[in-house]
């Protein structure tokens, strides 16, 4: 056996060992990932997080387990922990466009509006074809005070979601902030086929053709089930609050927003919007200067 042959065999053996270790690690990570998913699917979030945390310590360079833990934190309404995991991943995977979206979401849930918007903008920069679908970005524009950009986002979203009262309302809110309620009503987007209760009455209210009482009556009309009633109340209260806020009736707005924020966990992303808005109003109330002589 000559020296070159021995060297080649040595390299092949070493490469085989390294490949074997890599494959073994991959199998271990995938097995652990499946255990984490299984634990979470069975309702044991604490076990799933512990499995992920232990696995991350053993495989610090692998992002699969970090991603799983971050998503669990997000689902369990722990946005700060989710943000930390997503940030760690993005340092290792700066081209992971989906993680910018996910981090933007959990930053919004923490009222970090500018940071959230930066992440959503980065996501759109990387995946421009998603811009028309990204209504979440429009919401953050509103809370960040970027009303013209918000108006544009909701107009673009209208091209792919033509019968959504919520999109029309948020467009109205952005226009009202820059041009006043008369212009907002003038440019209010016409919606004819959104069957969610009581959004037909909400649309009429913002169009200047409906009343608060009509919305409240629609919420209870038809003897809805407990679940349907809760959903009707949520949407009714949220958009009544936003309507009165746009009209400058702060106390009435705050009352309805507070009602919509109760039980927000049951209403998905918009439930989180209600909570965020409620906390945002509370923050602004605390920051208002106290009148001289008041206690």
Positions of predicted regions on the chain:
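Residue-level recognition of tetratricopeptide repeat
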Residues: 37, 71, 105, 139, ...
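Alpha-helical segment of the N-proximal tetratricopeptide repeat
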Residues: 28-54, 58-61, 68-75, 236-243
């Amino acid at each position: 056996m000559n020296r070159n042959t021995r060297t080649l065999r040595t390299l092949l053996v070493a490469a085989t060992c390294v490949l074997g270790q890599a494959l073994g690690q991959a199998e271990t990570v995938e097995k652990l990932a499946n255990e984490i998913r299984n634990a979470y699917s069975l309702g044991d979030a604490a076990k799933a997080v512990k499995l992920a945390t232990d696995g991350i310590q053993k495989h610090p360079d692998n992002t699969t387990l970090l991603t799983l833990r971050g998503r669990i934190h997000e689902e369990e309404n722990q946005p700060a922990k989710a943000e930390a995991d997503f940030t760690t991943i993005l340092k290792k995977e700066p081209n992971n466009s989906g993680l910018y979206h996910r981090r933007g979401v959990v930053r919004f849930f923490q009222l970090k509006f500018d940071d959230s918007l930066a992440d959503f903008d980065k996501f759109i920069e990387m995946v421009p074809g998603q811009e028309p679908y990204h209504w979440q970005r429009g919401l953050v524009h509103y809370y960040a005070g970027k009303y013209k950009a918000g108006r544009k986002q909701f107009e673009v979203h209208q091209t792919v979601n033509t019968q959504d009262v919520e999109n029309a309302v948020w467009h109205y809110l952005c226009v009202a902030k820059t041009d006043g309620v008369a212009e907002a009503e003038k440019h209010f987007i016409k919606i004819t086929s959104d069957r969610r209760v009581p959004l037909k009455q909400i649309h009429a209210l913002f169009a200047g053709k409906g009343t608060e009482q009509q919305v409240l009556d629609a919420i209870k009309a038809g003897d809805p089930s407990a679940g349907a009633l809760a959903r009707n109340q949520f949407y009714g209260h949220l958009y009544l609050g936003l309507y009165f806020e746009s009209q400058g009736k702060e106390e009435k707005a705050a009352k309805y927003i507070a009602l919509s924020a109760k039980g927000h966990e049951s209403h998905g992303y918009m439930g989180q919007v209600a909570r965020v808005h409620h906390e945002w109003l509370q923050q602004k109330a605390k920051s208002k200067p106290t009148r001289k002589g008041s206690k």
